[in-house]
């Protein structure tokens, strides 16, 4: 291994005592290869098993906690006890080489495009009329529905424990439902979850995390990992949905009620790990990851994500993070981290051919609705993205 990459292979201990032998994380990647009813398939299991040695901490693609929160047509569910057996197989595959397996819990809110197809509307904090992907309404969640949603996260955590996962991650990133309650762009409510105060906007985040923590305290084995994924600011030009200062205040409140083991920073765009603060204030222009990590230093490990598709970018990102979440490179080269460790980084292959799909355990029908997100991030070469785009034509034949 080249000396400059050695920090990537230093061990890390999470707050709960879990030991990781390097700084790589297999970050969430939805393959869209489950059943329409949200059950894990053998394709999902085989894909996970092929990457079981990729990183010591592995996080699943999004598992939806409520039918109205389903983003992807062939994503997997954690909404019912019948999901547990398939999730158990998935967890076992992820853990086959000693990795820690974490189930990501999500509700896509107004972006729950498959729920929109099924029900004709979606839910959010406040009423909206949207035009994409077709004209539709966003209905505001009632107080009772919010309570049911909080309970759904708790039940999903219970199922993750029963399925044998080593942890759960609650995602509030990239305009998923929890984040939209925190943002003044989307939260126009006037009740106790409304936009009148920062604390009110934070209430759903805090309530969900507290409910998850309660289940962990009561039912999880020692060393169970509790992660949180979030976007530290939301801006549109000069308009602010929430600032990084407000996010840091949220994290103070979060750490008072939840024993988190990491914060994963996520957002949209290319090279997210290089994002700089856009909200006015003392942090303006500094790297987002640096600001958040400095604030949380000695309190909570911070994970960088987004765009680290070379060893040089990985080590650059680690300068302002405790570990790094890699997604698309592990799709096409499960040995990405191993090759860096062995000093063989020139043999990393991000450009793949149809003949490679079988050895990579990539399902023949996969990545439907995911390729446009890959296009946006551009972490993979165009040739690989074009190949994945061709797989989306196989759904009618196979599914």
From Swiss-Prot:
EC main group: oxidoreductase
Keyword Flavoprotein: yes
Alphabetical list of Pfam families matching this protein: Oxidored_FMN (PF00724)
Keywords, sorted A to Z: FAD, Flavoprotein, NAD, Oxidoreductase
UniProt-listed InterPro entries: Aldolase_TIM, NADH_flavin_oxidoreductase, OxRdtase_FMN_N
Transmembrane segments: none
Family matches, as CDD domains: OYE_like_4_FMN
Key word Cell wall biogenesis/degradation present: no
Enzyme Commission code(s) on record: 1.-.-.-
GO MF entry, a single one: FMN binding
Assembly: Directly interacts with lipoylated GcvH-L (SpyM50867).
Similarity annotation: Belongs to the NADH:flavin oxidoreductase/NADH oxidase family.
Protein name (record): Uncharacterized oxidoreductase SpyM50865
